[in-house]
């Protein structure tokens, strides 16, 4: 094993243990053993290409499936991105860097021509690792499996990334379909399909909104107020004053458009559905069934038509009256029937 090989080269048990290559039992009567026994070892390098640790994948069905070197004087896993030493120049050329969930994802992407991929090492993406990625690309692409674990990892990255956002530097996201990891997706769909996903990313600001609203019901004022409170509390964590201000504006836009005007969106959708019925009715008229002569139809002005729609909305949705009462006063209601 590795221990025997290193011992034959004069490396002491103490040095091997300090580098995380062997484990020394607390019971000194037991012999030290290889930390990565029965595992495929993957070298982890620093930015200069020097080996500072190892990752190990189990051969067989044992647990844990993946194992990294313990932290040592050379290796702090919160600061290191796997493959950054190889990916850096390629990322500069591609003007992008892909941050995956693990080093096996990076290996798969490299095999299919995406040599600008990196990954954290057994932890959620940290602030230090985001800062390292920003040195290469101001808006890294974070690639996650489309399963529950991938979504949870994405949410954790939002929590880590928000406080350190700064002008010109952010994160964008891509989620692979059908709960696939990059290796599975590339085997099934190939290089071009993955490249297409990279061109259809979700910006952090939009994912922050989705994090707080997706799958939730907000059809009462109290629920809407809670969503606004939660979103604004998260935005308040952004340290950069300018970026925080723009995020507040963007969230207010989401609140106005998706919480305040959802009613009007639904009305437009219903109107589009109704237009299909009207077109069908007109085709029936053209066949001579129940056609009404044009001269017999009453002429209605556009202003009166708009007013009818507004009044109908107020009848069916009286909660809108208080919100739009002042604007309603601006209408000139000359039609006696409508005034009543």
Task: State each model region's role.
Residues 2-140, 153-154:
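Phosphate-handling DNA/RNA-contact segment within nucleic-acid enzymes
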Residues 46-48, 88-97, 124-140, 144-340:
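A charged alpha-helical hairpin associated with nucleic-acid processing machineries
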């Amino acid at each position: 094993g590795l221990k025997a090989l290193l011992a034959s080269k004069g490396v002491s048990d103490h040095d091997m243990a300090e580098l995380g290559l062997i484990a020394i039992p607390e019971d000194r009567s037991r012999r030290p053993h290889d930390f990565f026994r029965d595992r495929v070892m993957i070298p982890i390098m620093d930015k200069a290409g020097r080996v500072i640790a190892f990752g190990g994948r189990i051969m067989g069905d044992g647990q844990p499936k993946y194992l990294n070197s313990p932290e040592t004087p050379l290796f702090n896993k919160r600061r290191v991105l796997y493959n950054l030493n190889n990916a850096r120049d390629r990322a500069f050329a591609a003007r992008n860097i892909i941050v995956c969930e693990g080093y096996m994802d990076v290996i798969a992407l490299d095999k299919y021509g995406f040599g600008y991929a990196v990954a954290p090492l057994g932890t959620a993406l940290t602030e230090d690792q985001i800062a390292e990625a920003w040195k290469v690309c101001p808006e890294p692409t974070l690639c996650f499996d489309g399963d529950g674990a991938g979504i949870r990892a994405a949410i954790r990255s939002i929590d880590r990334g928000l406080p350190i956002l700064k002008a010109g530097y952010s994160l964008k996201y891509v989620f692979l379909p059908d709960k696939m990891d990059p290796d599975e997706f590339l085997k099934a769909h190939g290089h071009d399909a993955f490249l297409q996903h990279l061109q259809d990313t979700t910006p952090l600001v939009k994912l922050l909104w989705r994090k707080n609203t997706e799958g939730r019901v907000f059809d009462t004022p109290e629920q809407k107020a809670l969503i606004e409170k939660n979103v604004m509390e998260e935005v308040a964590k952004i340290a950069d004053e300018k970026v925080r201000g723009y995020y507040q504006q963007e969230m207010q836009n989401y609140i106005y458009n998706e919480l305040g005007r959802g009613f009007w969106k639904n009305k437009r959708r219903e109107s589009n559905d109704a237009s299909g019925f009207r077109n069908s009715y007109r085709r029936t008229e053209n066949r001579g069934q129940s056609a009404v002569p044009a001269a017999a139809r009453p002429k209605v002005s556009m202003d009166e038509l708009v007013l009818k729609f507004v009044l109908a909305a107020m009848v069916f949705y009286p909660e809108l009256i208080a919100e739009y009462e002042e604007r309603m006063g601006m209408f000139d209601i000359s039609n006696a029937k409508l005034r009543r």
